Design a protein with these regions (language model features):
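Residues at alpha-helix termini
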Residues: 33, 50, 88-89
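Solvent-exposed alpha-helical segments within well-ordered globular domains of core cellular machineries
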Residues: 12, 42-45, 72, 83
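Basic amphipathic alpha-helical segments that dock to polyanions
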Residues: 10, 29, 40-50
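Amphipathic alpha-helical dimerization/coiled-coil segments
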Residues: 79-89
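Basic, amphipathic "hinge/linker" alpha-helix immediately C-terminal to the N-terminal HTH DNA-binding motif
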Residues: 59-77
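N-terminal helix-turn-helix DNA-binding core of bacterial DNA-binding proteins
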Residues: 2-35
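A short, conserved structural fragment
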Residues: 48-58
């Protein structure tokens, strides 16, 4: 399924924050990306409705398998590009 780059950015951010913090809530995404609470709330609703994330009763975000696959692919690509452009020489 084709998704927009903004959705990919949100999924990658959730993955990175999960690795760093363990638990992730929408406010963590707001703080990380600098977007408004309203924008992040709308995006999380769309990601949830499309089966990319789950939100528990405490507001914790969890990547579901389709979301995790996309996030890991994007994260891997960004790490590879960063490594390529940061190499000395």
């Amino acid at each position: 399924m084709q998704i927009h780059q903004s959705a990919e950015d949100y999924l990658e951010t959730i993955l990175m924050l999960t690795q760093r913090m363990g638990r992730v809530r929408s406010i963590d995404v707001v703080n990380e990306l600098g977007y408004t609470k309203a924008s992040v709330s709308i995006a999380m609703k769309k990601l949830r409705e499309n089966g990319y994330i789950a939100v528990d009763g405490e507001g914790n975000l969890t990547l579901l398998e389709p979301g995790r696959e996309i996030a890991e692919r994007i994260y891997s690509r960004h790490r590879l590009l960063t490594h390529f452009f940061v190499q000395p020489g």
